Amino acid sequence: MHIVLYRPEIPYNTGNIIRLCANVGAELHLIRPLGFELTEAKLRRASLDYSDLTVVTEHENLEDYVKKYPERICYATSARSRRYYSDIKFGSNDSYLFGPESSGIPPAVLDTIPRERHLLIPMKPGNRSLNIANSVSIIAYAVSYTHLTLPTTPYV
């Protein structure tokens, strides 16, 4: 599973997503420009020591990412989608794209991904959005339940 953050803005969110990726075995891809430095204390504080447990790769732009990994199916999350994320069959090598915290994926970028790959995370009508770290968690665990071998006894 590959989590792709398009121009992330808030280091705490990205740090939390790094921890999540380490726990579900996902790779994290960051599309520049970033709203922070990867060395920033806020990012390190949120990710704790989990950044050593996952692969984090920066890419100049989304086109470079897509060209580098043409075999990956790329899904995009959008509040404007009409297809629920739970309606797709998750692949273990697929990519899941999330937009900047302040605006989501820009329409011009969203238009580069086939409409049937736009995913909606349902929420209460009238609300604008979920926090990006929460959105990534929802998708990542949905994929994990499909492909991850869960322990037979819970971690205590």
Question: Which residue stretches match the model-derived regions?
Answer:
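Amphipathic alpha-helical repeat scaffolds
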Residues: 9-13, 129-134
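Conserved small/polar residues in nucleotide/adenosyl-binding loops
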Residues: 146-152
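Short internal beta-strands
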Residues: 28-33
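S-adenosyl-L-methionine/SAH cofactor-binding core of RNA-modifying enzymes
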Residues: 40-107
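Acidic-glycine-rich active-site phosphate/pyrophosphate-binding loop
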Residues: 105-118
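Residues at the starts of beta-strands that form the adenosine-phosphate
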Residues: 26-27, 73
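N-terminal beta1-alpha1 ligand-phosphate binding loop
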Residues: 3-24
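Gly/Ser-rich helix-loop-strand patches that form or flank binding pockets
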Residues: 116-128
